[in-house]
Amino acid sequence: MKTISLALLGLLVMGALSGCSSRGKEPPTPPTPPAPPSPTEYIQSKRIVSYNDQLVPTSGVILAYNSQGQVIKQQDQYYDRDKKELVNSQYNIYTYQGAQLTKVESFYDGGTGSYRRVGATTYSYQGSQLLKKEDFEIDLNGNLDPKGYEEYTWVGGRKSIMKRYQIFQGRTTLSQSKKYLYQDGKEIEEDYAAGAKTPSMRNEYRYDDKGRTIELTHIQYLPEFDNEGKPTDRYNEVSRQVTYTEYNQRGDISRARYTFSAGGVSSGSTDTYAYSELDEKGNPQKLIVTRSTPGSADQILVQQTFAYTYAKL
């Protein structure tokens, strides 16, 4: 299973805040803390605040955990320029059965101060294998209204095929499919548009012995065009980015190296993750991510602070 470190968690959550997509419904992976001073304590909540280059807050998120380290609530926050503070916006509630995520419910207040449920996602399994993911909107009466679903096929204990369907005005159509391949120690994920013969995107993952991504190759394709200038169902590679990720002893990202090529031109950069101001439990309270690019001055990409609360089992 793919794991996400503390630093990457902060980046993903902040990205979800800036563009609320359906992918943001998956719960953020909890941080990987060092060995706690007491086996009876756990992280109960964590607040992540992002800042601009003037050190003014831009967004925030508060994550609540259960005693198993699973995220049970994600409260998003935005910066109110009039109040000059972070205020709550939408939030998600996560439900589990054992180690498996079974339901996500999304709530939004629309500036009214009164939250209402606006969406939900359910997950169905056979043993440890995810078989179906269903997305719902909420109608005017508060009932679940199906808007699409994903079906997964497994072969030999591995994911093989995913098909995504959308539902509109009672009609169900195939909108996208994915194929999963396993070659040269990599897990390969190919995305296909409906009816396409070749992929529109390809991700190749290599993991370490702890299940963490240490190499990711992302390949983007664009469709071929016929003699009349119309797109066909075949795609050609137009760009490739390879990311090499390193981790510190805590299990958080310490460095990410990128190489990018497109149109015969190549470039590269390196992101360095600096954690500081450890609290009494050994968890960092500050993160700065700096990007170094040959021929350019270093650039600060991310400035975040973390605040934790702890609870006893």
Over which residues does each language-model region extend?
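C-terminal motif of bacterial Sec signal peptides marking the signal peptidase cleavage site
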Residues: 16-19
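Buried hydrophobic residues that stabilize the cores of well-folded domains
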Residues: 24-313
